[in-house]
């Protein structure tokens, strides 16, 4: 990839054979930092666009990382498709396309950061993509349990023909039949399926839970880590946070700092977060957020003109 460190965000498009496309944003490492070994791929949580992680990208790039973000197919954001057709397998497919695209560009050392629902997707593929390390934040490990808590009802137990057309999840209409059918057919739903996916994990892995998370049981995350036969895993808690990592500025800053420390540590082969990092200024974070919002609006307007 071309080094365009002076430009705040580089917009890429992965064109697929079926006419769909995945939008990717690249944040190069800051020119005045020591470049890290790994390129970071951020997989945002459900109903979160890649620009929601502008602040985290700014933190990571200020500490020497090239950062890659993307919007999944059939999701909110700038990639093709509608969210009522989203499924876990489509999320998996999108992540694998982005990883393959980076490999084709000669980028070998990839660190994966995944939040919430995307963490369950990362757990599913992590043993197959030859990543350098994995970081998850409020990562879903028992999808059926999390969905029941989020939706106030266990829809995965209903027969498919009794499901409502859409489920209101995080303020978006999730196509229930598409999503639930995929969950059951491809075994995304249980804690045991997550155990199976991460069994044999042999790369460094740090998981962050939130002590106020009502959607993910920390005990389930602990069981998952205990199920991994390695000493390269560590669990940390984001004190004072709920499942919503952006609920206030204090929680958000703690999330940015903690995940950045984890990335810097893992890039050096350590699991210890007691390290110094560069913290970007509030003005830099605000400027990046505003610029990315303008870029997103510009792209959305262009897509509307083409429709």
UniProtKB/Swiss-Prot annotation:
Gene Ontology MF annotations: acyltransferase activity, transferring groups other than amino-acyl groups
Keyword Glycoprotein among UniProt keywords: no
Keyword Acyltransferase: yes
EC number(s) recorded for this UniProt protein: 2.3.1.-
Pathway per the UniProt entry: Lipid metabolism; fatty acid reduction for biolumincescence
InterPro entries reported for this sequence: AB_hydrolase_fold, LuxD
Keywords: Acyltransferase, Luminescence, Transferase
SUPFAM superfamilies: alpha/beta-Hydrolases (SSF53474)
Pfam families, per database record: Acyl_transf_2
One GO term of the biological process aspect: bioluminescence
Stated role: Acyl transferase is part of the fatty acid reductase system required for aldehyde biosynthesis; it produces fatty acids for the luminescent reaction.
Family in the record: Belongs to the LuxD family.
HAMAP family assigned to the protein according to its UniProt record, in alphabetical order: LuxD
Official protein name in the record: Acyl transferase
Organism: Aliivibrio fischeri (strain ATCC 700601 / ES114) (Vibrio fischeri)
Record gene name: luxD
């Amino acid at each position: 990839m071309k080094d365009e460190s002076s430009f705040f965000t580089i917009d890429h498009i992965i064109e697929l054979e079926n006419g769909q496309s995945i939008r990717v944003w690249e944040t190069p490492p800051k020119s005045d930092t020591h470049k890290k070994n790994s390129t970071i791929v951020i997989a945002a949580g459900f109903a979160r666009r890649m620009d929601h992680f502008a602040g985290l990208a700014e933190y990571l790039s200020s500490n020497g990382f090239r950062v890659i973000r993307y919007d999944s197919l059939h999701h909110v954001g700038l990639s093709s498709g509608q969210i009522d057709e989203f499924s876990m397998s489509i999320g998996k497919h999108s992540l694998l396309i982005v990883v393959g695209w980076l490999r084709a560009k000669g980028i070998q050392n990839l660190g994966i950061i995944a939040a919430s629902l995307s963490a369950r997707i990362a757990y599913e593929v992590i043993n197959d993509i030859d990543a350098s390390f994995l970081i998850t934040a409020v990562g879903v490990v028992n999808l059926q349990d999390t969905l029941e808590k989020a939706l106030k009802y266990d829809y995965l137990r209903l027969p498919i023909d009794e499901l409502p057309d859409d489920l209101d999840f995080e303020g978006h209409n999730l196509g229930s039949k598409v999503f639930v059918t995929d969950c059951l057919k491809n075994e995304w739903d249980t804690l045991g399926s997550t155990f199976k996916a991460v069994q044999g994990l042999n790369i460094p892995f740090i998981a962050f839970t939130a002590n106020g998370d009502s959607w993910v049981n920390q005990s389930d995350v602990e069981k998952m880590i205990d199920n991994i036969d390695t000493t390269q895993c560590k669990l940390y808690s984001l004190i004072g946070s709920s499942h919503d990592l952006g609920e206030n500025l204090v929680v958000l800053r703690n999330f940015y700092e903690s995940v950045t420390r984890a990335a810097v540590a893992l890039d050096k082969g350590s699991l210890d977060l007691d390290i110094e990092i560069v913290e970007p200024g509030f003005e830099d974070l605000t400027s990046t957020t505003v610029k990315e919002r303008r870029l997103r609006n510009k792209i959305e307007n262009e897509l509307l003109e083409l429709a």
